[in-house]
Design a protein with these regions (language model features):
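Active-site core segments that coordinate phosphate-bearing ligands/cofactors
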Residues: 1-30, 41-57, 75-77, 81-224
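Gly-rich Lys/Arg/Thr-decorated short loops/hinges at beta-loop-alpha junctions or inter-strand turns
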Residues: 31-38, 60-65, 85
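A glycine-/small-polar-enriched, mobile loop at the entrance of the PLP active site in fold-type I
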Residues: 37-43, 63-73, 154
Length: 224
């Protein structure tokens, strides 16, 4: 809006990646509660609706957001004939709304209030599943993915976690980068790094790295 005003004028609707795919599959526009809760603090999870106060503060028209907010397990729509033909599936196949990736992974064993969970991938989310109101606005709180609407997930997020293995391989393990590597070469390189890391004692002999390679999210909130 501030840095690319011309592109801002061209925007008609904000959709998260999973809902964008669902739109092309069904022709229906909606958003699940977890995705809505992950959109920069503009979702009021007490009311299960967009926050008019935050939208006004940020200058975002409500019309730019999906008006239908549903649970992840709800049927968003049904497969169109065109999408069904391309995917070789039956037209009318139900398509669920889905949810944010990190919450989907918690279903492997974390679905009770009081449990903590670390989700490690490209980035890292480490948080608590609870049924309390958010007490610290520096952290992110979003609705949990079950139909039990009292459950919430509050977490701190590190932007670069698993992504650092690629940076390390490209800059310190040969200095040639990994972009030009064949897939087989990449696997061999990372396997060698994994074997070498296994020989390092716990604590890395006092070496400490602060993973602020792309700014930081909660609770630091510093883009630099």
């Amino acid at each position: 809006k501030e840095n690319e005003p011309e592109n801002w004028k061209r925007i008609s609707l904000f959709l998260t990646p999973n809902q964008y795919v669902a739109y092309h599959l069904t022709g229906e526009i909606a958003i699940d509660r977890t995705s809505a809760g992950n959109l920069g603090g503009i979702f009021d999870y007490e009311r299960n609706d967009w926050s008019d106060e935050m939208l006004e503060l940020l200058g975002i028209p409500r019309s730019m957001l999906p008006q239908r907010i549903i649970d992840p397990t709800d049927i968003l729509g049904r497969l169109t004939a065109e999408a069904a033909a391309e995917l070789r599936l039956m037209p009318g196949t139900p398509v669920c709304a889905g949810c944010i990736d990190c919450l989907a992974s918690t279903l492997s064993g974390v679905y009770t209030a009081g449990h903590t969970v670390a989700v490690l991938a490209t980035s890292l989310n480490w948080g608590l599943l609870h049924d309390q109101r958010q007490k610290n606005p520096q952290y992110i709180t979003m609705p949990y993915l079950t139909k039990e609407h009292s459950l919430r997930y509050t977490y701190g997020g590190i932007s670069t976690a698993g992504a650092l293995t690629k940076w390390f391989a490209g800059n310190l393990a040969g200095g040639t980068g990994v972009q030009g590597y064949e897939e087989r070469e990449k696997k061999l390189l990372f396997r060698e790094l994994e074997q070498a890391a296994a020989e390092i004692p716990a604590g890395s002999e006092g070496l400490l790295m602060l993973p602020y390679f792309m700014g930081e999210r909660t609770p630091i909130w510093d883009s630099k």
